[in-house]
Amino acid sequence: MEKNKFIKQILTIFVIILEFILFNYSFYNLVTKNYINNYGKGMQEKSINIESYLPFKDDSLIVHESSAIKIVDNIPQIDGATALYPIYSAYVEALYPKESVKYDGKDFLKDSKIQKTGTTVAYQRVIDGETDIIFCAKPSKKQLEYAESKNVELELVPIGKEAFVFIVNKNNNINSLSIEQIKDIYTGKIVNWNQVGGENKPIIALQRSEGSGSQTAMLSFMNGIEMKKSSQSFIGGKIGYSFRYYVESIVNDGNIKMLSINGIEPNIENIRNDKYPIVDNFYMIYRKDNTNENIEKIKKFVLSEKGQKIIEDTGYVSVNGY
């Protein structure tokens, strides 16, 4: 009897576990998987493939440009934002010797003169004096406060222009929002797509990580207006934000689309003529107290016709209009 009772208990536990597994599998396929796939990988963090844009590589996707300026001694280390890596990788190829780039097949070695740590880490590294030059969007309030706490002043040299964009699923019937509508979505005043002419579906307003270039741009866009926290709901239609080049060339996901703002598309022409309402500069950044004389040479090349052509041919808009 005791043995039969024990067997029944084991079978009951097994059935409960099996039901739990089946429930979770069904939930994943019906809800979670749909939530992830229906709106595309573009809403998730995605990094650029280092090797695809590696300098001194024959099949690299970078713009190959020559330079009369060659830096062979006291070479400044360069780092920066993921989305700008194709630009500063091209600068390294144009200006630096091949042996200055050290790559192990997965990542750059510590003593390589080019790194790709991303905006947040790159700002910390340049402020701490661990790298010489970074290419990024403007610093966040916290990054500026960190620099001030270290008694560091940063030099920000504008080198190009880029559109800050909002992205949704390609099947969302909304193609344009006003600036006020976007602000109302992110403050929680607008909570359903039907409030802006879309389907009767809750809006899931996503945010990026603190200190990233996109989050800093979003905080600047909101201009001090507090945003509600990102929704954790499984049901609804997502909206997110990033920079145009990152969405088009790095994420490159056919399941998402960029919204027009006030009826104006975020394309190259509208960025160049400042018709698109959310355009900002990106920068070459270094410490003002950095005494490396080669920084000025790099800046001169970056702002030259060839340096600005690299920006244009990569897919951005140059600040000097070349």
What is the meaning of each model-derived region?
Residues 2-148, 152-162, 168-322:
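Exported/periplasmic ABC-transporter solute-binding proteins
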